[in-house]
Regions:
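Hydrophobic/aromatic-enriched cytosolic interaction surfaces used to assemble or bind macromolecules
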Residues: 1-324
């Protein structure tokens, strides 16, 4: 009873602030939500270039100032981020039997979890010099929480796409068959070592053939980029870069997904996966999306996905679980 009273007083008279961070490519995204008496009093989203001045990590000083101003003004401020370390999918029971005390684990559902080596886990924390990261979530927890109410009896492939990396999960209502992350860009040395099994490369012949195939699209867009610098042409410029970047990554993404599917078909008795659900956090170009669908020869359904928004949703859920 006392616990419930404390919780009610806290929610009624104290603001709770949730601040989430995510670094992708050369941008840091953050969402700030302030809640009081079960009502959202303040909510905003900001992006910062990580190439600008930073302090002992990847968070720009401007973002640090926002974070610290809220934490100083509101005692109940919680920070969340997404793990970028290599994670291993495991059944919870098997993980407990392994007795890996120095391997932090993150639950995906009631049956499965992912764990990371303590060294990689600490590197994740060092990336965000805010105060403490209260909640560090697995990308696979974010994926599963987003799709769990729409899981089907047959297995589907769920793909979370960022500019610098992507994550995919093969699952149905009962099982998770595979969870894997793949880097599209070289990672900072202080963050994670690049490992051969986690990288994807294209040989010169495949790259030349692919670029030749999309050259007409690139030429027409580059022509638009060379016009006078009006507002419309700035949008065309951004559209061109989005297409070129997206189209160049499609063979890499498709190859990794096909490898993952082959490994699951070889090791598990499951039906063929016929559909990909793309959780798009980087606004993939429509032509790149169509190219992915054609390359995989599978239906690809795209959903808008805000990483920082989902991080704050999970942080609020976790905070509710452990509230006094």
């Amino acid at each position: 009873m006392l616990k419930g009273l404390k919780k009610a007083l806290k929610e009624r008279f104290c603001s709770q602030v949730y601040i989430s961070f995510n670094v992708d490519h050369n941008l840091l995204s953050t969402q700030v939500i302030r809640i009081k008496n079960d009502r959202i009093k303040e909510k905003f989203f900001k992006t910062f270039e990580t190439k600008v001045e930073t302090k002992s990590g990847e968070v720009p000083i401007q973002a640090l100032k926002i974070a610290r101003s809220y934490s100083q003004k509101y005692p109940y401020t919680y920070f969340s981020a997404m793990s970028k370390a290599k994670e291993v999918l495991c059944e919870k029971q098997a993980f407990e039997e392994l007795k890996k005390e120095n391997y932090p684990a993150c639950a995906i559902n009631q049956k499965y979890c992912v764990y990371v080596e303590s060294e990689d886990f600490l590197k994740d924390f060092k990336r965000f010099k805010v105060q403490d990261v209260d909640f560090l979530f697995s990308p696979f927890s974010l994926i599963y929480d987003f799709v769990r109410d729409s899981l089907e009896e047959k297995p589907l492939l769920y793909l979370l796409l960022e500019r610098s990396r992507f994550y995919f999960l093969i699952a149905d209502k009962k099982e998770i068959f595979l969870a894997k992350s793949v880097f599209l860009e070289e990672q900072p040395e202080e963050f994670i070592e690049s490992k051969e099994e986690d990288s994807v490369e294209m040989n010169d012949e495949i790259m030349k053939a692919f670029l030749s195939e999309i050259q007409e699209d690139i030429d027409s867009l580059e022509e638009a980029m060379g016009l006078d610098r009006s507002k419309d042409n700035k949008e065309k410029n951004e559209d061109a870069y989005s297409l070129i970047e997206g189209m160049t990554n499609i063979p890499l993404i498709a190859n990794a997904l096909q490898e993952g599917l082959r490994s699951v078909y070889h090791s598990r008795d499951i039906d063929f996966v016929e559909k990909v659900i793309l959780l798009d956090s980087c606004q993939i170009h429509q032509k790149a999306l169509m190219h992915l669908q054609e390359t995989l020869m599978m239906e690809v359904s795209r959903l808008d996905f805000s990483l920082v928004e989902r991080l704050n949703i999970l942080a609020r859920m976790e905070n509710e679980k452990h509230a006094f």
